[in-house]
């Protein structure tokens, strides 16, 4: 549980099995903590589109996000376009969303908000 520290400061933990799949009440608590992210696929994933001025900045964000994904051992699905990236998180090992998805979503948002790729 990450209630005592901000999501972007938390780290992913190994999560396997349906015991770690988040229920509706926990999703309702976590979703407001990651503004701009939306539930997708009937609550099985979260997504957000990040927009950039050009392809260079788009790929810079993708590369920085790949570093975060490697460090956290939790990897998003990405749709990479000239001026945007669609990021999708879901935890396959739990069959839906886990806390790890929200931790990484917060880290991705922080990366974008800090303008690391500008």
From Swiss-Prot:
* Gene Ontology annotations of biological process type: tetrahydrobiopterin biosynthetic process
EC category: lyase
Keyword annotations from UniProtKB, A to Z: Lyase
Show the GO MF annotations.
4-alpha-hydroxytetrahydrobiopterin dehydratase activity
HAMAP family, sorted: Pterin_4_alpha (MF_00434)
What NCBIfam families is this protein classified in?
PRK00823.1-4 (NF002019)
Q: What family does the entry list?
A: Belongs to the pterin-4-alpha-carbinolamine dehydratase family.
Q: What is this protein called?
A: Putative pterin-4-alpha-carbinolamine dehydratase
Write down the species.
Xanthomonas campestris pv. campestris (strain B100)
Taxonomic lineage is: Bacteria, Pseudomonadati, Pseudomonadota, Gammaproteobacteria, Lysobacterales
